[in-house]
């Protein structure tokens, strides 16, 4: 059942992720190009202005059940986060991020965790964490960034649990 739920949530996350990544690429292509590792001073990456993106994402996220968004450049450096996340400029060495930099999409389901800060949007929620490559234009072209998306799947889990009780 968890494998099926993971597949379903990955498909939901992929759909939401592509909508978001297309918006990011279409409306912030210049920033993404500047954030890529091609000859850019890493210190410049930390001062890029994504305030318009942040405002837009925060307004859209609730309608598609997205809890958090992170954006990494093509070297795995965190360059954008919606809220309450690690400092920009930090490198992420997770396997899922490295795979996304190579074009692979991955999703992991996470149960509510008491260790999560109560102020965090993840607190008390089941969520699916998905890493998606952001391409320059269309899939198959150069990967310019990776989008890490946290989708609230609490309602789906509750629905599956109620169906399991019936059977």
Region locations from a protein language model:
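N-terminal membrane-insertion alpha helix
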Residues: 1-14
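Short N-terminal helix-loop-first-beta-strand/juxtamembrane motif that initiates sensory/input modules
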Residues: 19, 58-78, 105
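Helix-start (N-cap) segments at beta->loop->alpha junctions
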Residues: 112-116, 135-136, 148-165
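Short glycine-/small-residue motifs
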Residues: 81, 146
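Extracellular/periplasmic ligand-binding regions of membrane signal-transduction receptors
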Residues: 13-52, 74-79
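Extracytoplasmic/periplasmic sensor domains and loops in membrane signaling proteins
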Residues: 46-50, 83-125
